[in-house]
UniProtKB/Swiss-Prot annotation:
It comes from Xenorhabdus bovienii (strain SS-2004). It catalyses: a phosphate monoester + H2O = an alcohol + phosphate. SUPFAM superfamilies: HAD-like. Belongs to the class B bacterial acid phosphatase family. This is Class B acid phosphatase. The gene is aphA.
Length: 237
């Protein structure tokens, strides 16, 4: 009996020592508020959709005209824009008004752009449906361009299905894409920017948001889903 008592005493002593050691451990300095599992589960009320869900929603509809924005929607083109900023206006964004930049961007620097996987998947889905695809960009128009060529190659579009890229331009206070979307009777438009979704809403057509990559040169990032539009899941790449 005495041995049993000694064993329990030793165990109790060990636990008391462990408590003393733990009591002396200092927590590191907090660097953020942190997050709980409950908070992680409370996602924003966004209407997420997948490529498969979009395709299913169109299954009973005939082929239609649909449109895509280009930069940050089907192409990650930040390398060219970053190069242009460094070369023409490192301290501000005035390079976007410089014709020399657009000549480079529209004819050479898309060689450094990467096609987004979501762009390939969506384009291929619409091609399979027989839809007529238009690319409408806010880039400034130049006398020559190779953007059409790069898109055709990068997104695997057959030559006879590829429409020439439409350069709508970017005028302050004016959404130049609307007239082009109306002219081509688009029924659906994909874009990463608020202006893309606003243009679709203006014409009462279906606007679907593509997520802009967090490392895009186009900052700040927009609030996807803020207009109640559908947002394609995992579309940042």
């Amino acid at each position: 009996m005495r041995k049993v008592t000694l064993v329990f005493s030793a165990i109790a002593f060990a636990f008391s020592l462990n408590g003393v050691v733990q009591a002396k451990v200092q927590m590191p300095e907090s660097v953020s508020s942190g997050v709980t599992t409950v908070e992680l589960s409370q996602r924003q009320a966004v209407h997420w959709v997948s490529v498969e869900q979009i395709e299913k929603s169109l299954q009973d509809q005939p082929p239609m005209a649909i449109g895509f924005d280009i930069d940050d929607t089907v192409l990650f083109s930040s390398p060219g824009f970053y190069r242009g900023k460094l070369k023409y206006s490192p301290n501000d964004n005035s390079y976007l008004k410089n014709p020399a930049f657009w000549e480079k961007m529209n004819n050479e620097w898309d060689e450094f752009s990467m096609p987004k996987q979501i762009g390939i998947e969506l384009v291929q889905m619409h091609l399979k449906r027989g839809d007529n695809i238009y690319f409408i960009t806010g880039r400034t128009k130049t006398k020559t361009e190779t953007v059409t060529k790069y898109l055709q190659e990068d997104l695997h579009i057959p030559a006879d299905k590829m429409n020439v890229v439409i350069f709508a331009g970017d005028d302050p206070g004016k959404n130049n894409k609307i007239s082009w979307m109306k002219e081509h009777k688009l029924k659906l438009y994909y874009g990463d920017a608020d202006a893309d979704i606003a243009a679709a809403h203006e014409l009462n057509i279906r606007g679907i948001r593509i997520l802009r990559a967090s490392n895009s040169s186009y900052q700040p990032l927009p609030k996807a889903g803020r207009f109640g539009e559908e947002v394609v899941i995992k579309s940042e790449y």
